[in-house]
From Swiss-Prot:
Entry's localization field: Cytoplasm; Nucleus
Ranges of residues in domain CUE: 140-183
A single Gene Ontology CC term: cytoplasm
Xref: CDD domains: CUE_CUED2
Originating organism: Danio rerio (Zebrafish)
PANTHER family: CUE DOMAIN CONTAINING 2, CUE DOMAIN-CONTAINING PROTEIN 2
Keyword field: Cytoplasm, Nucleus, Ubl conjugation pathway
Sequence similarity: Belongs to the CUEDC2 family.
Domain of life of the native organism: Eukaryota
Main location: cytoplasm
Protein name per the record: CUE domain-containing protein 2
InterPro entries linked: CUE_CUED2 (IPR039805)
């Protein structure tokens, strides 16, 4: 049974029941992966119902489907929790069918199938785990796992076993692998009120990167443009003011007027207004 198809059909039926004319073509892989992550958290054993942040979920879907925020939050919660329970039961049914099919095969064939199915992901870890179990007894192995879990609270049981398998039962080597990041720790969902806001750091970063890659507009021409200031065509005019019959600048500095020498032709045009001479006769 395809879990993605279950989520897809349930979400479509829920939206169309409240918004009949909704455009469901906007629901792409990005929003479906976000919903899948939220449902996985709700279906986990450590999840608590109060940790589901309905406001963030409604705000996210409102960006894709206008009018989703008008749906009652209680109905949205009921839909999400019912869908999470449905997915959990579907996973349990699928795992039960796989166990029944494995029981029909002989022991050697089932071992070959299990090793062949997981060879791509855990081939190296399986070989090293076989060497480790030959050196360390089961009781000491459990004690070492418990010590690792106490030293690294964020470390899960699977990750502790992987570190011990790679280190071949060497406690110091396993601690070094976890500290140096050779065995990546996945943070478990916290029981705080903000759990619904972030599914996990890794999923959140992948979601952001996919949204930016799909919807962000990058102006490539902006880097090619060269911005140059416009040069003025004419020099700014200097303001000259007059104060007390003297030419001064805007700062109050005085200038002495220098008379220009006029040509002789211009001087001939001037009229002399001198009074006539008085002639006295003896």
């Amino acid at each position: 049974m395809d879990l993605q198809k279950i989520i897809h059909d349930a979400l479509y039926d829920f939206i169309l029941s409240y918004i009949p004319h909704a455009d469901l073509s906007t629901l792409d892989d990005v929003i479906l992966s976000y919903i899948t992550g939220v449902l996985e958290d709700l279906g986990s054993q450590e999840s608590v119902e109060e940790n589901f942040d309905v406001e963030v979920f409604v705000e996210m879907l409102e960006a894709y489907i206008p009018g989703f925020s008008d749906i009652d939050s209680v109905k949205v919660c009921e839909m999400m929790f019912n869908l999470a329970a449905k997915l959990t039961s579907a996973r349990d049914t699928e795992s039960g069918e796989m166990k029944i099919e494995e029981g029909k095969f002989p022991l050697s064939e089932s071992c070959d199938l299990s090793l062949g199915g997981s060879r791509e992901k855990t081939h190296n870890l399986t070989l090293q785990a076989e060497g480790a179990t030959a050196q360390v007894s089961e009781s000491s192995w459990d004690n070492q796992e418990q010590h690792l879990l106490e030293m690294f609270p964020k470390c899960s049981v699977t990750e502790a076993r992987s570190a011990l398998s790679i280190a071949k039962g060497d406690m110091e080597e396993a601690v070094r692998l976890i500290i140096e990041g050779d065995v990546q720790l996945k943070c478990p969902p916290s029981l705080s009120a903000n759990q619904g806001k972030t599914v996990s750091a890794e999923v959140d970063q992948k979601l952001k990167a996919s949204i930016l890659e799909k919807y962000m507009l990058v102006d490539d021409e902006e880097d090619k443009k060269v911005h140059r200031p416009v040069t003025p065509k004419d020099a700014p005019k200097k303001m000259v003011r007059y104060h007390g019959s003297q030419v001064v600048t805007t700062k109050g500095e005085r200038y002495h007027l220098v008379k220009k020498e006029e040509p002789e032709d211009m001087k001939k045009t001037y009229v002399s207004l001198k009074p006539a001479r008085k002639y006295r006769f003896h």
